[in-house]
Amino acid sequence: MKSDVETLNPTRVKFTVEVGYDELKPSLDKAYKTIAGQVQVPGFRKGKVPPRVIDQRFGRAAVLEEAVNDALPKFYQQAVEASDFLPLGQPTVDVSQAPDPKDGGDLKFSVEVDVRPVLELPDLESIAVTVDDLQVPEEEVETRLTALRERFGTLTGVDRPAADGDFVSIDLRAEIDGEEIETAKGISYRIGQGNMIEGLDEALTGVAAEGSTTFTAPLAGGERKGQDASITVTVQSVKERVLPEADDDFAQLASEFDTLEELRADLLSQVEQSKKFEQGLQARDKVLEKLLETVEVPVPESLVEAEIHAHLERESRLEDAEHRAEIEDSTRQAIRSQLLLDALADREEIGVEQGELIEYLVGQAQQYGMEPQQFVQMVDGAGQVPSMVSEVRRRKALAVAMEKATVTDASGNPVDLEELVGGTEEDDVTEDATEDVTEDAAPAEEGQTVDPTGDDEQAAAEATAEDPAKS
């Protein structure tokens, strides 16, 4: 086999392949066996029809066509492996010459396919970004203390009109043109939640127990979803939450601390850690943004179109041109990020340990509210493990970039990102959960890595992957 590759543009190449007739013999033999198993010829058992009879009854051309169809993927893959390119998406094949049914001859074909672009990456130590100063507002400590007091608060009935933050028990009746559509009784609701019916909070404010009011709002569900209905709400009771005093007794009740001062100090530490984490996330986003500004990352249009199509199909909005335009920029930016981090991971020779993959899968399961084993089975069944491997690899590549980049705050002080790079709040998983997933994962020796190259990486590039800047 002879093959050449021509670069059409930074993200697309053309392979030209020539295969000698002798090299097609395994595929020809296979073609005869395939056809013999599909046809019935009098005097021969199924699958035992000799080649000469197949040629006589069905023609040599049919055999060659079957052989060429079998051989094309194999020789295309050999041409890819002989090159330095990683195909992305589906190839376009053109057979320019097929063997002659009588005289034989070579098979010649060409393949155009999108490929991962070759990027010129900078020295990571040349990357410098500035983030906001670390500020710990005292009011956030008070907010956390109030939230803790609310957890230990008690509900007490009040003889006054309902106000924001009160807890009410209500009955609801919805009507359209005098026809009762739906009713509900004894619903507990906190005024100000804003998660039930549009305008409900405003309608309830100022209404006392045993009082009622009527307002108009669109229905949130059912057969008449979106239609305006007349909503009558009757208040059965009004209660307010009485908070315990913030003192040493409360500190002992709500925490492991003996004094309110110790509890406040702990809440202050929590706020400080949260702000450090936010500062670290800002640094991560800015490092990636700086890399994208520095590196020219051409994007294969087929990937953009495939991702947009998949997104619209999931939302059943394939004909929504306006929404297509809305998501195109974000899709293109996400793919640029993926391609850049893939290239960076290659240069830094980053692999993925099985334990790292398991930890990531457990974290994702928690985000989706699923049991780790159930999530792993779902991901494996959908063939999405390779995309998960690539996502972990990209995260590690970005972590390397953050470690080597210079990050300072607005005051010029260096920012320590060790906690974020070494593991985030989202990465903390229980040992039991990790062990559960390990039982479903493929076994690996200590230190063994999951191969992020070849078919795995190609599948990952074609799959929907989250933007690493937002993970």
From Swiss-Prot:
Superkingdom, natural source: Bacteria
Alphabetized GO MF terms: peptidyl-prolyl cis-trans isomerase activity; protein folding chaperone; ribosome binding
GO biological process: 'de novo' cotranslational protein folding; cell division; chaperone-mediated protein folding; protein transport; protein unfolding
A Pfam family of this chain: FKBP_C
PPIase FKBP-type domain segment(s): 165-244
InterPro entries: PPIase_dom_sf (IPR046357), PPIase_FKBP_dom (IPR001179), Trig_fac (IPR005215), Trigger_fac_C (IPR008880), Trigger_fac_C_sf (IPR037041), Trigger_fac_ribosome-bd_bac (IPR008881), Trigger_fac_ribosome-bd_sf (IPR036611), Trigger_fact/SurA_dom_sf (IPR027304)
Region (Disordered): 407-471
Keywords on record: Cell cycle, Cell division, Chaperone, Cytoplasm, Isomerase, Rotamase
Catalyzed reactions per annotation: [protein]-peptidylproline (omega=180) = [protein]-peptidylproline (omega=0)
Known EC number: 5.2.1.8
Main location: cytoplasm
Compartments reported by the entry: Cytoplasm
Residue ranges with Acidic residues bias: 416-443
One cellular-component annotation, GO: cytoplasm
Function: Involved in protein export. Acts as a chaperone by maintaining the newly synthesized protein in an open conformation. Functions as a peptidyl-prolyl cis-trans isomerase.
Assigned protein family: Belongs to the FKBP-type PPIase family. Tig subfamily.
Stored NCBIfam families: tig (TIGR00115)
Domain-level remarks: Consists of 3 domains; the N-terminus binds the ribosome, the middle domain has PPIase activity, while the C-terminus has intrinsic chaperone activity on its own.
Stated name of the protein: Trigger factor
